[in-house]
Amino acid sequence: MKLILQEKVANLGNIGDQVVVKPGYARNFLLPLGKAVPATPEHIAEFEKRRAELEKAAAELLAKAKARAKKLEDKTFKITANASDEGRLFGSIGPREIAQAITEAGIEIEKREVDLSQGPIRQVGEYEVPLRLHTDVSVNVKIEVAPENSNS
């Protein structure tokens, strides 16, 4: 299926690129999320009129992501969790908890931007966690997992 990309899509193309993708990828991902439109003559003409404003919006998103990445550089965020004496967590720390800790520190992060491809954190310690703020911007932050002080 031939499409025109409305925004940059990782491993596919940039704004305005005409790409050929499998119909399922187009139907289930690109079209419903507004990342692309079918490459009909009408859409091609309409896109050429709107190209400048779409590119400007994409540049603004990139600038915002770079600004957030600058704020996040060399930062350590502490998360406390209930843990055993050996340092194993009761439960785990996933993208939601990491995003919440960073947001509470004053930098807005969504859980979909946290890349825990190695799986959730299950031990006390320091971890380097990558954040994907934009298709072109990623930054690593340190997450320090500490046991909760329990005096039982």
Swiss-Prot record:
Pfam families: Ribosomal_L9_C (PF03948), Ribosomal_L9_N (PF01281). Binds to the 23S rRNA. This is Large ribosomal subunit protein bL9. The keyword Heme does not apply. Belongs to the bacterial ribosomal protein bL9 family. SUPFAM superfamilies: L9 N-domain-like, Ribosomal protein L9 C-domain. Keywords: Ribonucleoprotein, Ribosomal protein, RNA-binding, rRNA-binding. It comes from Coxiella burnetii (strain Dugway 5J108-111).
